[in-house]
Amino acid sequence: MAGTMPWRWNGTTLRDARGTDIAWVRDGVLTIAGALSGDPTQPDTLFDVETSLDGATASPRFFLRASPRANRSAGSEAAKQCEVSQAGLTVTRLRATCGDAHYLLERSAIFGKQRRIVALAEDGSSEGAEVARLTPRGSGLEVSASNPSGHGLPDVDAVVLSYGCLLVDTTPRIVRG
């Protein structure tokens, strides 16, 4: 992860440790700042985001799909579709794919909402190494690399996966009776 860690989602804006906006969501579009790559001349990468929380779908199970906009993202060749979905009956364990990469996003405590992101084998079957931790903080979410050097989780994957967890773990829920 190239951005200065830890990152923090505050509402729909993700900022690095210096307070620089590195990603934001507006009207169903996730924008990842090109400067996150370390090159300030890089254009922003745009994703169309669809979730089960939008109300457009009738799915009782959580999912998030982030599809790169090929026509507006100059880096769209490198950007890949990302999907996050429930791995069981509850949102305790989420499975995710970003291109060919597979991840498990699991809560690290029974009653807590802190999560760890585990990079899985290519087929998604075996346990792998923890690459990041996500900790809810009020109405936001803190993202930190498990590896001090920050290697192991691409920045784009970290942004999309953490946004999915932000929706699940910090959004107020409407309980239907």
Predicted segments with their positions:
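Low-complexity or membrane-interfacial segments used for flexible interactions
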Residues: 1-29, 33-35, 76-79, 90-177
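Short, well-structured hydrophobic secondary-structure segments
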Residues: 29-77
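Short, aromatic/His-centered strand-loop micro-motif at the edge of beta-sheets
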Residues: 82
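Surface-exposed, interaction-prone regions used to assemble/regulate multi-protein complexes
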Residues: 85-86
